[in-house]
Regions:
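Alpha-helical scaffolding segments of alpha/beta enzyme cores, especially the outer helices
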Residues: 34, 38, 66-69
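Residue-level recognition of the N-termini of beta-strands and the immediately preceding loop/turn
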Residues: 7, 47, 79-82
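Class I S-adenosyl-L-methionine
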Residues: 57-104
């Protein structure tokens, strides 16, 4: 896929919920960071990328921290990166959003 092609990219990290879900089948830090980096590359100006990371399972915080490290390193002249969370509850999902600024 070429760069500047996509308006919205969404990631929902963790494992498939439900009583029969295999909690070993889940997203992993290394592949998630690679996928998010690819998503950022294909965002067109004005596009948005979101990542919802769940921190209540093994490896969840590490995965969110790795994504935060990646988006924190984006050029602020080209991107705005934010993190939203509920601060009065434990292990709440983190919503990370990246907006690629419009070109002038």
């Amino acid at each position: 896929m070429e760069t500047d092609a996509v308006g919205v990219v969404c990631f929902n990290l963790g494992y498939l919920p439900g009583p029969t879900a295999d909690k070993e089948v889940r997203t992993r830090r290394t592949t998630t960071v690679s996928a998010v980096a690819s998503g950022v590359r294909v965002l067109r100006p004005g596009g948005v990328l979101t990542v919802v990371g769940y921190t209540g399972h093994e490896g969840g915080w590490e995965e969110v921290e790795a994504v935060m490290e990646l988006v924190s390193s984006l050029d602020p002249r080209e991107f705005t990166a934010t993190n939203h969370s509920v601060v009065n509850r434990d292990n709440c999902p983190q919503l990370i959003a990246v907006h690629r600024k419009e070109t002038k």
